[in-house]
């Protein structure tokens, strides 16, 4: 267990102030395009493809959560070579969970393996975001 903790603490961390937010699960922190680990947010409008429902609410929530200083710990590189990470800020000790808890994004279980199940259950049970009225 100590070896696992040492390895987790040895993984790279990037930091930035007021990152540029692309959508509800992607931001730019310095030179790195960061995909939030375990988070799946609706896509914003791209070209002729219209925005998915709640895409801009998810983006705005991530903007709110990333005001000020942000740090992201590396998890892996995805197939697009993006830095996939677990992020925190002055506004939240766990941005990934907070976006899911808002109800505007869901857990990306294929990768997270249930790491954010509690956050998603909270969003559902309280009827937040896209869970409202369900």
Segments from the language model and where they lie:
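Small beta-barrel nucleic-acid-binding modules, primarily SNase/OB-fold domains
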Residues: 2-134
């Amino acid at each position: 267990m100590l070896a696992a903790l040492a390895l987790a603490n040895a993984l790279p961390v990037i930091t930035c102030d007021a990152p540029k937010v692309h959508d509800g699960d992607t931001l730019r922190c310095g030179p790195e395009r960061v995909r939030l680990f375990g988070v799946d947010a609706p896509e914003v409008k791209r070209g002729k493809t219209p925005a998915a429902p709640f895409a801009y609410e998810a983006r705005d929530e991530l903007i709110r959560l990333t005001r000020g200083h942000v740090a992201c710990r590396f998890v892996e590189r995805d197939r697009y070579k993006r830095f996939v990470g677990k992020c925190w800020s002055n506004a939240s000790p766990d941005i990934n969970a907070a976006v899911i808890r808002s109800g505007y994004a869901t857990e990306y279980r294929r990768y997270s393996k249930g790491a954010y199940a509690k956050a998603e259950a909270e969003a559902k049970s309280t009827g937040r975001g896209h869970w409202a009225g369900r």
